[in-house]
Curated annotation (Swiss-Prot):
Keywords: Aminoacyl-tRNA synthetase, ATP-binding, Cytoplasm, Ligase, Nucleotide-binding, Protein biosynthesis. This is Histidine--tRNA ligase. Homodimer. The keyword Isomerase does not apply. It catalyses: tRNA(His) + L-histidine + ATP = L-histidyl-tRNA(His) + AMP + diphosphate + H(+). Its EC number is 6.1.1.21. Belongs to the class-II aminoacyl-tRNA synthetase family. The gene is hisS. It is an enzyme of class 6 (ligase). The keyword Cytoplasm applies. GO terms for molecular function: ATP binding; catalytic activity, acting on a protein; histidine-tRNA ligase activity; transferase activity. InterPro entries: aa-tRNA-synth_II (IPR006195), aa-tRNA-synth_II/BPL/LPL (IPR045864), Anticodon-bd (IPR004154), Anticodon-bd_dom_sf (IPR036621), His-tRNA-ligase (IPR015807), HisRS-like_core (IPR041715), HisRS/HisZ (IPR004516), HisRS_anticodon (IPR033656). GO terms for cellular component: cytoplasm.
Length: 416
């Protein structure tokens, strides 16, 4: 029996990679316009980073992480999200000594042991943005604007932006007390996970996926009634900045996000009832994992989810021309000459290919059609002797006589 890929993973095949290149190129261009610079962090980190940063009571840490002991008996985890590793890199490399704010983006694989379903894999890829060093609500609004603009760049219009303010540790104490009071009378009906969270982190009860727990929590107290003046002012400033960008939003007091590091601003972007992007502010994370107190804000966007959203909205990703020219050959001398010519034309910026399968001339031309070559040429003894050949435009069959000694002429005809 042939070995298959692990459940929840998916191969990116050569005929589909152009979709990813298109998305990554657009997002990189957009990131540059916002003065974001790329960061790359390891695929695995010390488990403690996520336990301290993401939160021990979260679903991610309790149920979804791929954790193992390495040969040095150290607990290692494949990263389930990108923010904590970026924060660790910020501290470890002394980026707090650089001019602030530090603005960064990344493309990264993330790993979560989840139930596999449409749009949800155990390995997926994320575009993430993080900004370290500013407390200003203008940065929150800027990143939300970037995320919304990204979807507009991909022609996805039917979006709903939900925002909330989940306060700071001080004002959350009062809110947690109110949540305990609310859920206490239904405690026996809660799932086992929520019973554990009831004392340690009652806000996580609002993030439970259990149907019964969701039903119990639908009339729970809202955080906006408990936030302190500083958090409230930050939220009002955020709304003012969003209004200045003409970004429509809905205040949803039940958005808490699934990670413990969030403070103040949290947001989600929805398309057809599916969350396609989410993020928020995390002013305490850097200190939690051993750094100097540093405010920060960021978001994550799943690439697989984005591609699925494009498909569901019937938005085609433009397919680039795969091959500029295919050079076929006749005989041993023709094969060597075609091989040399193909490699020479590649130095002129052309996507060029020749026969590597010893096919007949007819089969070579079928292959040229199959790989969608714009032009083709056949090289045999006659062409080698006369130093010229016919360049065929595949679209209409028109042929042009060209000199094999003038590569610039051939390249200019194909690229014009």
């Amino acid at each position: 029996m042939a070995i298959q890929a692990p459940k929840g993973t998916k191969d990116l095949l050569p005929m589909d990679s152009y979709k990813w290149h298109y998305i990554e190129d657009k997002l990189k261009k957009l990131a540059a316009e916002y003065a974001l610079k790329e960061i790359r962090t390891p695929a695995f980190e010390h488990t403690e980073l996520f336990e301290r940063g993401v939160g021990e009571t979260t679903d991610v840490v309790q149920k979804e992480m791929y954790t193992f002991k390495d040969k040095g008996d150290r607990s290692i985890t494949l990263k389930p999200e990108g923010t904590a590793p970026a924060a660790r890199a910020f501290i470890e490399n002394g980026l707090f000594n650089e001019a602030l704010p530090i603005k960064m983006f990344y493309f990264t694989p993330v790993f979560r042991y989840e139930n596999v379903q449409k749009g949800r894999l155990r390995e997926h890829h994320q575009f993430g943005v993080e900004v370290f060093g500013s407390t200003e609500a203008s940065v929150d609004a800027e990143l939300i604007g970037l995320a919304m603009r990204a979807f507009k760049e991909f022609r996805i219009d039917n979006l709903e932006l939900n925002i909330n303010n989940i306060g700071c540790p001080e004002c959350r104490k009062k809110y947690n007390d109110a949540l305990r009071e609310y859920f206490r009378e239904s405690y026996d009906e809660l799932c086992d996970t929520c019973k554990t969270r009831f004392e340690r982190n009652p806000m996580r009860l609002l993030d439970c996926k259990n149907k019964k727990c969701k039903e119990i929590g639908k009339d729970a107290p809202v955080i906006l009634d408990y936030v302190c003046d500083d958090c409230s002012n930050h939220f009002e400033n955020l709304k003012t900045y969003l209004d200045s960008l003409n970004i429509k939003y809905k205040v949803n007091p039940y958005i808490v996000r699934g990670l413990d590091y969030y403070t103040k601003t949290v947001f989600e972007i929805i398309n057809n009832d599916i969350t396609v992007c989410g993020g928020g502010r995390y002013n305490g994370l850097i200190e939690q994992i051993g750094g100097k107190p540093t405010p920060a804000v960021g978001f994550g966007m799943g690439i697989e989810r984005l591609i699925l959203t494009l498909m569901e909205n019937n938005i085609e990703i433009p397919k680039p021309k795969e091959m500029d020219i295919f050079i076929g050959s006749m005989g041993d001398n023709g094969k060597i000459e075609a091989f040399k010519l193909v490699n020479a034309l590649r130095t002129k910026g052309l996507k060029a290919e020749c026969d590597h399968m010893n096919k007949s001339v007819k089969a070579q031309m079928k292959y040229a059609n199959k790989i969608d070559a714009s032009y083709s040429m056949i090289i045999g003894d006659t062409e080698i002797e006369e130093k010229k050949a016919n360049l065929k435009r595949m679209e209409d069959g028109q042929q042009f006589e060209v000199s094999l000694n003038n590569l610039d002429e051939i390249a200019s005809m194909i690229l014009k």
